[in-house]
Structure formats: structure tokens, C-alpha cells
Amino acid sequence: MKRSRQLKPLSSEHHQALLVAFQLRNALDGHPDSAGAPKDLPGQVALARRFEEQVLRSHVRAEEDLLGRWLAQRDTRRLASEHAELLRLVGIARDGAAPDQRAALHAFAELLERHVHWEERELFPYAEGHVDEATLATIGGELERRLVLARSDAKSAS
């Protein structure tokens, strides 16, 4: 799918998100080797946590801060609601008991995939068609700046 240069940093993170969703789903369904995902539940939880810490939190903030004001109200609500649910599910996986962790990881993987597809197929094309080039350029510049900061923060945290 063709994506405007300005939104490519978010699309790149969506690619990472789809890989994590795929790995978690395969691992939880008993096929971890096919996706390179951890075989045990603690490893699967660690994968979700790493993704949350290194990508998801900053990604959520960037989308809501930079795109939210340009979207239709229903899309802004859905964006915020699904982001909150993704973070809630990672929290359950991180802090819950084993049965809850498995269920939360499964729900997280399914929602993550659905959410990314919605953004890439509907939300981003809408934004690209309704936001002028100058604003998209401003958004793209801010995304690049945030991406550099997020990578720097992730390196210093590890």
C-alpha cells in the first residue's frame, strides 16, 4: 500500500506491530517455531512488554497528538479507545496470573492486528486525503523527531 512519506514512520512501526501479533498468535496457538516467538509464557509476556515499552507507548502518543485533531470525531474516539485497550491488555499480561496472561496476550495480538489494518486501510488514507501538504509535512517532521527521541530513550533504558 502506498503511504505518504510523512506517515511512513508510523507505517514502519505498524509493520513491527504485525510481526509481534503474528509471533504471539503462533506461539499461543502452539506454533512458536514458525514465527520465531518465545515458546514459554514468560517469554511471550516479555515480547509484548518490550513492544509496549519500545514502540507502542510512543506510537500511541504520536498518533493521538499529531493526527487526532485532523480526524473525524468517531475515528478519534476509536483511535483512543483501541489504544487504551491495547495498553490495558499488556498490563494484564504483565501483572496477571497465567490464565489471564494467555487470554490477554491473545486478545492483544488480535486487536493489534485489527487496529493496524484499520489505520493503514482507512485512517491513514483519510488523513492523507483531508490534510493539506504543509500540515502533513509538519506532522512528518514531528514524527521523525519523536522517532529519534524514542529510539534514544529505548537505548538508554536497555
Protein language model regions, located:
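Small-residue-biased structural context
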Residues: 1-158
